[in-house]
Amino acid sequence: YRGLKKKAGKEEDWANYKSYDLFQHAFKILQNAMYGTYAKNGWRYTDGYLICSAAITNSGQRLDQESINFVNQKLNTELNTDKNYIKLADTDSMYIELKEVIDTKYGIDLTKEERNQKILELAQEIQDAANTNLDNISKDLFNIKPGTHYFQLKQEVICTGLLTTGKRRYAMYVTNKEGVSVEELDMKGLELMKSNMNKLFKKFGEDLIKNILFGKSKYEIDNSVIEFYKHLKTLDPKQLGKPTGVKQISEYHLPPRAGEMFSSFRTKAPANTKAAVRYNDLLKFKKLDKKYESIIEGDKIFIINLKPNVYKLETIGLPNAKVPDEIEKFVKEFIDIDEIFESLLLNKLKELYKDLGWEFPALNENITKFFKF
């Protein structure tokens, strides 16, 4: 599937390119699952002592580490240097910094296309040499003849920038994927890409990472954070809410007692349930529940944090449907933008700045007094 995907990409057949990419990814997951079965004592081919599963993992790690050492030695010998050219490595991959190699061999006055072509040529050269080395290692370690094993390294991506903040936490901007020109941001393990981010905050986080990868200064990054924070105050509340589904209203909801305005809840009621019920209560209190739809189980809502208000509501859930003007006006007046920014983005930005060794910019007195860097 990987070969078919590469062929489709070169022919700019993007529909089949995406299909083959999904197929090869699914097959990769299936292969990993097969390897995992060796660690289950209930499988008929396992040994009961994790010997086979440990052998699979340790063999891969050993081959990867040997390949890392080989590539570093090769480049240091060619350039007469003593440095680590492997900037990121996993159990089955490594990312090689080639800027110094390209600049030394071909100069700095290359176009983006020329540079990518030279990188592909150099990657092929390194790949061939490293795979020959794998033949030798396989013979020495496992007594496997060259050409009879399936160990091999293949070039996958070219990146213009790479940010690593810890084990399995990185971001890279990919410009070539298996020989096909692309423009993709690939992130793993970074808080800025977590699933609880709404589209607005996630888009800002992705753009921020791109700007860091493209080498923008701390001053420029600081300004983008400050301007984004100011921009939040001009937006519709739904754009700021945390998107979530509602599943357990009936399980936790206790209707209001006589003379009471708001419902109560059973112990450990989820935040999304409380936010949805508070919206429904407000609809009934304002006698708008006949004109506007209440939130029901299965609906999607946006949870909005509120400042102290006359109803003593801490949050409210807004539905995708039309919201009454009275409730919309109330939410706009009492929406707690600082709290939303802190809960959805500030801590994630704080972690990123800490990883970069930067001091976080002052947004205003209220939002930074509890967050010292």
Residue ranges and their predicted role:
Residues 3-9, 32-44:
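Active-site-adjacent bridging/hinge elements
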